[in-house]
Amino acid sequence: MLSPKDRADLEERISKIVVSKGFYFIDLEERMEKGAHIISVVVHGEPSVTIGDCEKLTRAILPLLESFPWYGDNDHLEVTSPGLDRVLKREWEYEIFKGRVIDISFDRDGKSQTIRAKLVGRENENVVIEYEGNYFRIPFDQVRKAKLVFDEGGKEHGKKQKRSHRKGT
């Protein structure tokens, strides 16, 4: 797994590549899977991210990874879209995914509440939602969890797309 310093450096460099190709950089995730170190780059595009987009980004990011001395035979790059049920982790994600339907859990009057609402965006230190025709502002520090949900009308992301590359293949 990457050190915090290496991770921050890698996120910054990958973000520049992703943005230069016309996409939003959402996250860099790491995991171990069957002895392989998986580096997963999560990206978003409008109206969606295709497999072709993931392939294009993989080709653009891979030379950067291969330039690092720590990148070896057991390292694996995966470029993926956020998917249908992405948990929103950073405040700026609320702006990127505005207009989408979310399930949001938050504290209200000392109790936890979960509702399905339309994400309007963010405003100062609040997430703004539309629920039953009314607009509400929920302070970020009261949000326990917010995740994208699939909208039957097709407004949400399609099937999660990804493209993977293992060094040496």
Curated annotation (Swiss-Prot):
Q: Does the keyword Membrane apply?
A: no
Q: Name one GO cellular component term.
A: cytosol
- Per the UniProt entry, the signal peptide is none
Cross-referenced InterPro entries: Ribosome_maturation_RimP (IPR003728), RimP_C (IPR028998), RimP_C_sf (IPR036847), RimP_N (IPR028989), RimP_N_sf (IPR035956)
* Compartment(s): Cytoplasm
Domain of life of the organism in this record? Answer: Bacteria
Q: Name one GO biological process term.
A: translation
Alphabetically sorted, this entry's keywords are: Cytoplasm, Ribosome biogenesis
Cross-referenced Pfam families: DUF150_C, RimP_N
Task: Note the PANTHER family from the entry.
Answer: RIBOSOME MATURATION FACTOR RIMP
Q: What does this protein do?
A: Required for maturation of 30S ribosomal subunits.
Name the family the entry cites: Belongs to the RimP family.
- Tell me what this protein is called: Ribosome maturation factor RimP
Native source organism of the sequence:
Coprothermobacter proteolyticus (strain ATCC 35245 / DSM 5265 / OCM 4 / BT)
